[in-house]
């Protein structure tokens, strides 16, 4: 999040959240289309197609999402994955959830949101961020909801063996405006800072008394 800009004379800086815009990759070739008008119609057709696909995926997600009465619902997290190998792409449910949250926050339909996409208008985010999968071996420890430091277990036992825990973390980029301040803030009059913020996710951990269990821990989730 970009820390709220404060006058140069002021010392305190307060935090302010920001929205993330997930990207969608399309497949297709427009070289066979003739002329700029055909190309425009082709892009519009592709956008309409993906709009319907996203709507269907969101409907399916809501249908299969565990109910509040289900005890396994506590284990549901879009940023944690159990897998035998490193995931190659961002979690699909995470992308869909971020996209839906933005639509709800902006009170927009998907069609209106698509035509007002900042990427289409050449806009840039206030703070640059990077996202990647992180293993429990790389995290080693984390802070739980009670403020205690716990050990993040690398492997989770399953009926047919073991799976590794992976966490999809987002943090401020070390390059660009992360150290120079928030993009769009006049540095002559205001101080600003991009800062990584955290959220809680469910993970298999062990406390200092060697008790193993599923706990909520803090991981980096936005900039």
From Swiss-Prot:
Chain's role: Promotes the survival of neuronal populations that are all located either in the central nervous system or directly connected to it.
Propeptide: 6-114
Glycan-bearing residues: 107
PROSITE patterns: NGF_1 (PS00248), NGF_2 (PS50270)
One of the GO biological process terms: negative regulation of neuron apoptotic process
Localization of this protein: Secreted
Descriptive protein name: Neurotrophic factor BDNF precursor form
Leader peptide range in chain numbering: 1-5
InterPro entries on file: Brain-der_neurotrophic_factor, Cystine-knot_cytokine, Nerve_growth_factor-like, Nerve_growth_factor-rel, Nerve_growth_factor_CS
Keywords: Cleavage on pair of basic residues, Disulfide bond, Glycoprotein, Growth factor, Secreted, Signal
One cellular-component annotation, GO: extracellular space
Protein family: Belongs to the NGF-beta family.
UniProt cross-references to Pfam families, sorted A to Z: NGF (PF00243)
Domain of life: Eukaryota
SMART domains assigned to the protein according to its UniProt record, in alphabetical order: NGF (SM00140)
GO molecular function, one term: nerve growth factor receptor binding
